[in-house]
Amino acid sequence: MKLSILGARVIDPASGLXXV
């Protein structure tokens, strides 16, 4: 899931924080 968070943070910083 870490990879998804890292990728999401590039697309949308809020998602990375968030963590989704």
Curated annotation (Swiss-Prot):
The keyword Transmembrane does not apply. Keywords: Pyrimidine biosynthesis. The keyword Iron does not apply. GO terms for biological process: pyrimidine nucleotide biosynthetic process. Belongs to the metallo-dependent hydrolases superfamily. DHOase family. PyrC' subfamily. Non-functional DHOase. Heterododecamer of 6 active PyrB subunits and 6 non-catalytic PyrC' subunits. This is Dihydroorotase-like protein.
